[in-house]
C-alpha cells in the first residue's frame, strides 16, 4: 500500500492540538485594519478550532496529523 500524500495547503493552515483537534487562524486580519476596533482585532488574533462539521475533511487532507 503506497503512502498517502498530505495536502500541503492544509498542512500550512492547520495544526493539531494535544487532544487531536485542529487549530486554525481567523479571517479578516490581513488588511483594512484601521476601521476595525481594537477589541475585534485582539479577538481575531486568537486561534480558533476547526468546526466539527469540517473536521472530517481536514482529517482526510492531513492523514498523518
UniProtKB/Swiss-Prot annotation:
Gene3D superfamilies reported in the protein's UniProt record: 4.10.410.60
Gene Ontology, cellular component aspect: cytosolic large ribosomal subunit
Record-level Gene Ontology MF annotations: structural constituent of ribosome
Pfam families: Ribosomal_L35p
Protein name: Large ribosomal subunit protein bL35
Species whose genome carries this gene: Oleidesulfovibrio alaskensis (strain ATCC BAA-1058 / DSM 17464 / G20) (Desulfovibrio alaskensis)
Family matches, as NCBIfam families: rpmI_bact
InterPro entries named in the record: Ribosomal_bL35, Ribosomal_bL35-like, Ribosomal_bL35_sf
